[in-house]
Amino acid sequence: MRLVLKFGGTSLSSPNHIRNVAKIVASFSKDNEIVVVCSAVDGTTDDLLTISRLIEEKKKDDVTKALNNIIKKHKQFANQTVKNSAIRKQLIQKLNTDVSELKELVRGLTLLKEVSARSLDYLISFGERLSDDLVSFALQDIK
């Protein structure tokens, strides 16, 4: 059977919660074809919306601080979620790639001092992208 499993931000609010999500996915995947949909880690969407507001308010230092907090949180989660060092290293590399793209976007928006609707959608998508990384590698870690 094909199943879609959707996990909200509260389900991804800590490394333990992320590992539990991976275990749930693994348990359903034994006899089913699974599609996993993840929201951003709890609070991340709000943080990204704050960054967009700060960009428009021209508060560059606050933008940098908020962005660094998001990055720090996800890297801490990565280090605490994945136990296998080789898998954790791959996760950190993937996060670094996504974070580099996020930083480039935020830098560009900060230079423009505006966030269009399309840019906001792109910015907000990073919450889901980063949580997808965490869940995907947590799943590899438990197999």
Give the predicted meaning of each segment.
Residues 1-143:
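Nucleotide/pyrophosphate-binding catalytic subdomain
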